[in-house]
Amino acid sequence: MRLKAKLFASLLLVSSVLSAQDFKLTESGYFKNAGVDVMAYDDIYPEGHQGGVCIIMNGNRVATNGDIRLEATPGQWQPVPKQLKRTVGENSIDVTLCFPDSSRHMTGFNPMIYPDLVFNYQVKVEAVGDHIEVSVDLDKPIPEKFIGKVGFNLEFFPGSLFGKPWIMDNKSGIYPQQPNAPLLETTSNIHHPGDFYTGNGSLANAKQLIGEGYSPIVADDVIAEPYAVGRKFTSQPDDAYNKVTIESLTGDLKLYDGRMNHNNGWFVLRSEIQPGATKGAVKWIITPDVVKEWMYKPVVQTSQIGYHVNQPKEVVIERDVRDNRNLPVELLRIDANETRIVKTLVTEEWGKFLRYNYLKADFSDVTEEGLYQVKYGESLSPIFRIASDVFDRGVWQPVLEYFLPVQMCHMRVNEKYRVWHDRCHMDDALMAPAHSHIDGYDQQPNLSKYKAGEIVPGVNIGGWHDAGDFDLRIESQAGEAYILSMAYEAFKPEIDATAIDQINRVTEIHQADGKNDLLQQIENGALTVVNSYLALGRLYRGIICNGLRQYVLLGDAAAMTDGVIGNEDDRWIYTENNPSRELSTAANLAATARTMKGYNDTLSTHCLNIAKQIFETTEANERLVMTKVHAAAELYLTTQEDVYKDYILKNQETIIAQIANAAWYLARVEQQFAQLKDKKAKAFSKAFRKALPQAKAQLDKQVAETPYGIPYRPHIWGAGWDIQSFGYRHYFLVNAYPEIFDAKPVFCALNFVLGCHPGSNQASFASGVGAQSATVGYGLNRADWSYIPGGVISGTALIRPDFPELLTFPFLWQQTEYVLGGGSSHYMFLVLAAQQILNK
């Protein structure tokens, strides 16, 4: 009897150990086993390496985009499947998908060319003990001409694999730093184009997309030979925290280097669909190593630069939900001779956000200047300063000192020995043909006095390259000038660290010219908008390269075109009929007119006249009333004319209903209305102020949703830009109504950008600012894994449903891209706002 009891106990023990090692489907809709998570078709952005089957191991995303693809190593321009249905079962996830996605064939924001191939398929992702099984059923066999092209791919993140080992059956290797020959030539799918255009949206020009020679939209004609072929593959066999083994039961596995035909590619493991295969066309067994004792190391989140002595100071501690330890939170002071504990902080349990639990601790009462660090168990925050001059040097200044000069178009940009880029795009621009293009550009017919291909003169001046794409978009140009104008009006910072010569088209970084750099940059933005308007007789949509290979250029912007006006490499200029953007631009130009007055009076006059003309000629339906109110507000502040005051007063009811969104740009107007003798203006002022507490209550509710003190609802794209924009808008409320609106959200938004944000990567989003910052960014020098000081990246993104991620990788635009029309300029504004508020 005793023997039976011992045997039964042993069986129970073995059973519990085995069950503890099993993958289980969580309430969040993904498979989990200790520190290993396997998501399945929750993300919806495969062209951005977020989709299909995704493997996260101990806080690192190691592989993603497990799905059927039509090429061995596709890039962002290749066809992606359309997801039709996703069903979460007891311990499996079943997904139905199809090719093609007709809505993306030859049309849309970035058109794709789908081959003449139509099929549906089902993917089943199932937890089976200590591994995940992936099986694919097709509704029909793959046609012979596509055999070898269609397969199941899984992409491995290259940034953490360089120099790391892999094993395929009996062959082994090291992931290389760069892609290596030999090349493999294949017949491209482009030779079998489909006809799936639905008639919705403008049609792209296939010949223009494909171009001549290498084309990013042709991904499969020349690729790298696979590094290995076999049935069982192990990545990082030496590292239990990142080791994963994949076995194919239906065909060979092949390991490819996707960087051979796309510089931004990933390593790809794939198995091809075999001839005649339908049910069980793919069957993989994925076995990640599971380290049972692994627990997410607490992350101590603070600003990477530190805090003004008068600033609210909080530390946020991010912990594993299983971590119930109550460890002391210690504030350390670092002096020349010692590091000592100056205070043990009182912690507040904030609760769960995304996948982590959060603690918070306040140390606002610490005002002695010096170097500090926060310690929680074995985890440390970055070293930061507390000082009254913490924002005074090298914090907001790099935006004007480096980033905006580097982004200047139609310029040569020098920095002493260095040339950031040569004089570029002096052959701008030809009138765009009427068809759908790339990056959202879509020329409609009969919107210009110029015919397609005709030279549009006078537009080769001013502007900034938008992000890493080199185009000039109306919202990025006028919007940037607007934010900079708001900064100049609010703070009037003195800075002269660049010499900008618009006549000879040369910018010299770290060479003073006696002019305020902020005003010079406002001028640069206004020049492109005004000159394009004068040339076209209307606003441009933007200027962009005419070919896809030009669009993906990595390197000197001057290499995109030859600078000779009127030939086939010239960029195209677009127009559009978009009342919303036109009215927004009117608001932008009206404000820019104020800052340019006395600096460049001719440009100021043009800005104001264009804004007035747009306001007068653009009808606003119900959906656009508030956009026109914004334009009226800026025009009133510039001119004090009754026509704009009357438009605002006429729409009082709508404004009050939209107070939460409109108060920031109407606050300055309301304060002027309150001083007028006009009864209607005074009544407006009274109603406006009465509605503000409602907006405050709405804001308080949103702020309470996160441990970071700001409205923050993560999504696929990094949220840094949105949070900076929020802080920028909130400043105007704090400045006008300090008795209602607290300044703390301004500081919280700034701290978020400077490092106090979710995830293990604590880097400041502002490149070159702070102890640790984003020094690999999606800018013009991304191919060199480098950065532009003062550029502000998109920031921590969300791997759905709950994993915050910020990779050190230059080719993920949704995490590390720089932009114009916000981003860095909003960040600069926030720093100046904090400086002003705290120094009062």
What positions do the PLM features span?
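Aromatic (Trp/Tyr) and acidic
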Residues: L203-Y241, I305, K313-G377, V390, ...
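Beta-strand-rich N-terminal accessory domains
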Residues: Q21-E90, T186-I223
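Bacterial Sec-dependent N-terminal signal peptides
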Residues: M1-Q21
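Carboxylate/His-rich catalytic cores and anion/metal-binding grooves
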Residues: Q477, K515-Y540
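Beta-strand-rich recognition/accessory modules
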Residues: Y214-E293, A834
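Polysaccharide-binding surfaces and accessory modules of carbohydrate-active proteins
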Residues: D22-L25, K140-D238
